[in-house]
Design a protein with these regions (language model features):
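Short cysteine-rich loop/turn motifs with clustered Cys
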Residues: 14-46, 69
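Cys/His-coordinated zinc-binding microdomains
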Residues: 37, 51, 73
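A boundary/linker detector
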Residues: 1-19, 24, 39, 102-137
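Short Cys/His-rich "knuckle" micro-motifs
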Residues: 43-50, 79-83
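Basic nucleic-acid-binding interfaces
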Residues: 87
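Short beta-strand-alpha-helix junction that forms the catalytic/metal-binding core
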Residues: 31, 55-76
Length: 137
């Protein structure tokens, strides 16, 4: 049975979160929370989003997802201090103009084709395998 585009898009989003956490990991597999700096193994981290995950224009943008500890991602994003820390980290890393562009994109709708999503999924899976091999080496 063919997966719906929504299901395929969700698979891509989950893979992107895994990729981002792996990419941020050091040789021992640890990465720092984007907002509080706490170091944990990449498998214990979550993929936190600057622009909430439901916004389609930014959902599959690598720049929108960063490692976050469970505390910051699940509970902290409800607190203004964590939201401000996330935005501050974004500005420090990408610059104010880029962050403002992303914030404008939050109100836009992007419809990805099945072909785009299947290619995206294959590409991100390849990148994940490469990073997993590097960590095992």
């Amino acid at each position: 049975m063919t997966k719906s585009i929504a299901a395929l898009r969700e698979e891509c989003a989950v893979l992107l979160q895994k990729y981002v956490r792996l990419k941020a990991a050091d040789s021992d597999g640890y990465c720092a929370c984007w907002t509080c700096g706490k170091a944990e193994h990449w498998k214990e981290m979550q993929g936190g989003h600057f622009i909430e995950r439901g916004k389609t224009a930014t959902k599959l943008m690598e720049e929108n997802v960063h490692p976050q500890c469970r505390s910051c991602n699940m509970y902290g994003m409800k607190k203004a201090s964590v939201v401000l820390a996330y935005r501050s980290a974004m500005v420090d890393f990408y610059g104010e103009d880029f962050v403002r562009d992303m914030e404008r994109m939050a109100s836009q709708v992007t419809k990805h084709s099945r072909q785009y999503l299947e290619e995206y999924k294959a590409d991100i899976k390849t990148k994940i395998k490469e990073l997993e091999c590097e960590l095992k080496a």
